[in-house]
């Protein structure tokens, strides 16, 4: 253990000088532990990460927690390795910070638990899985129109209060129940209150036992917010590589990862690039995203909530993220206001997996027909608003008639929302989803009322609901 001294403190950036020409490697973790000697001092237990070498024996580091109370001359110890965090089954049902320390007021992690470094190379080219496999979510609108790929990266767009969190919870629930899969949730630079609410909601809905949670929220210094995504990813990699699992990794919010990187870059004195972002923006994003993939052992499928600053999709932060995505799920406030949940926009959501050679010819054709019908309905809405339905041709009336049924049938009840809705949730296999929409498009259920299609699972439930409404089927 080589020792050094703090020689400069600039907010979250700390310079450390070592003895005898020792120079810790880049990304090494350094520890400062100081006991308060009087009431003017505070106890300090701080981890620093080496970012730059300044000469033969001096390093510039980024603090992973507040530097309050730090003074020049304090002793620093080089741990000789990067930050490492606990991995494996001990992480399930627990909440951690960026350093892998539990913050849920439960027992400490056993000392003998395995710990892995958060900085690791991406899987080698020959280790990657070559076949494209669809991840069935049981959520109709996702499986039909913007299917997720195992080992893929999905962007989740949506404003406040349109159902991002509930959709994330339902995905965690369905993967745990139907696939026995594990989920890792990384809260990056978001509100602590939301993280707390999510933890309690997951506890209530019973999915917490299959989930590890890591938080570096918006009150933390930029170093913690920048590294917490890597902490979550390291935990997910263990389940993929050592247990052969298909893991879900949720990152909320990936924009905050870039934002923290930008703050760190400025503090380190790097020249900013476009819009004031760090010059290493694409590299940092690539290092994170390339580790999220399918290998011959298992897969990490990542769902990343993306905040778009000022709704400007050309901003370098979201634009860099887009280049890595395989699918997008867009949540639309208008649909939420109509009571259609999940409020996924069927026309704006996309996936590169929606191709006949991946999902099959029938699925592809049904999805395209659904999109065409909804698109035509969208075009006709202005005419309907001005002139009314009576002015439409018979053909267009039929399009509107079916489109409204399709729109309602894209909604369904969620398991994790049972305590609010009082209705049991539904998991719909892809085959059933495709069959249901094909039959609606073919006019098999034109005689059933629109309301029978709202918030149901399989197409058989529509028929039962219509019977309960007193309609002859």
UniProtKB/Swiss-Prot annotation:
Record has Cell membrane as a keyword: yes
Catalytic activity of the protein: ATP + H2O + 4 H(+)(in) = ADP + phosphate + 5 H(+)(out)
GO MF annotation: an example: ATP hydrolysis activity
Stated name of the protein: ATP synthase subunit beta
Matching Gene3D superfamilies: 2.40.10.170, Bovine Mitochondrial F1-atpase, Atp Synthase Beta Chain, Chain D, domain 3, P-loop containing nucleotide triphosphate hydrolases
PROSITE patterns: ATPASE_ALPHA_BETA
Function: Produces ATP from ADP in the presence of a proton gradient across the membrane. The catalytic sites are hosted primarily by the beta subunits.
Topology in membrane: Peripheral membrane protein
Family: Belongs to the ATPase alpha/beta chains family.
Assembly and interaction partners: F-type ATPases have 2 components, CF(1) - the catalytic core - and CF(0) - the membrane proton channel. CF(1) has five subunits: alpha(3), beta(3), gamma(1), delta(1), epsilon(1). CF(0) has three main subunits: a(1), b(2) and c(9-12). The alpha and beta chains form an alternating ring which encloses part of the gamma chain. CF(1) is attached to CF(0) by a central stalk formed by the gamma and epsilon chains, while a peripheral stalk is formed by the delta and b chains.
EC assignment: 7.1.2.2
């Amino acid at each position: 253990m080589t020792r050094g001294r703090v020689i400069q403190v600039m907010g979250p950036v700390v310079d450390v000088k070592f003895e005898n020409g020792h120079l810790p490697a880049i990304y090494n973790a350094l520890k400062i532990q100081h006991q308060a000697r009087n009431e003017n001092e505070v106890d300090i237990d701080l981890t620093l990460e080496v970012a730059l070498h300044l000469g033969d024996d001096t390093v510039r580091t980024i603090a992973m927690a507040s530097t309050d109370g730090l003074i020049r001359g304090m002793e620093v110890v080089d741990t000789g390795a990067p930050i490492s965090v606990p991995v494996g089954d001990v992480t399930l049902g627990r909440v951690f910070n960026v350093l892998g320390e539990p913050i849920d007021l439960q027992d400490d992690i056993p000392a003998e638990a395995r710990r892995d470094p958060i900085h690791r190379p991406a899987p080698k080219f020959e280790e990657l899985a070559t076949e494209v496999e669809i991840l069935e979510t049981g959520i109709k609108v996702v499986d039909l129109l913007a299917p997720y790929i195992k080992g893929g990266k999905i962007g989740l767009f949506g404003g406040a209060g349109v159902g991002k969190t509930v959709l994330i919870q339902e995905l965690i629930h369905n993967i745990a129940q139907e696939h026995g899969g594990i989920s890792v949730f990384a809260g990056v630079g978001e509100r602590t209150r939301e993280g707390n609410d999510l933890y309690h909601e997951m506890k209530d809905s019973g999915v917490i036992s299959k989930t590890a949670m890591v938080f570096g929220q918006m009150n933390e210094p930029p170093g913690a917010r920048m590294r917490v995504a890597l902490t979550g990813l390291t935990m997910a990699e263990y389940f993929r590589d050592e247990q052969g699992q298909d893991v879900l990794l949720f990152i909320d919010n990936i924009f905050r990862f870039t934002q923290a990187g930008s703050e760190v870059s400025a503090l380190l004195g790097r020249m900013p690039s476009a819009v004031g972002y760090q010059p290493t923006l694409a590299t940092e994003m690539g290092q994170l995203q390339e580790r999220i993939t399918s290998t011959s052992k298992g897969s990490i499928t990542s769902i990343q909530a993306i905040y778009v600053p000022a709704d400007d999709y050309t901003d370098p932060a979201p634009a860099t993220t887009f280049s890595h995505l395989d699918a997008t799920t867009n949540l639309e406030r208008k649909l939420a206001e109509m009571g259609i949940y999940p409020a996924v926009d069927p026309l704006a959501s996309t996936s590169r997996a929606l191709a006949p050679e991946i999902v099959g010819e029938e699925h592809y054709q049904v999805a395209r027909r659904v999109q065409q019908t909804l698109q035509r309905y969208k075009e006709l809405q202005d005419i309907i608003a001005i002139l009314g339905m009576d002015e439409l041709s018979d053909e267009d009336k039929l399009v509107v008639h079916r489109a409204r049924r399709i729109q309602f049938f894209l909604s369904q009840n969620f398991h994790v929302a049972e305590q609010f809705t009082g209705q049991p949730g539904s998991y719909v296999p892809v085959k059933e989803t495709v069959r249901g929409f094909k039959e609606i498009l073919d006019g098999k259920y034109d005689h059933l009322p629109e309301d029978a299609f709202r918030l149901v699972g399989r197409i058989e439930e529509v028929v039962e609901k219509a019977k309960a409404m007193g309609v002859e089927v």
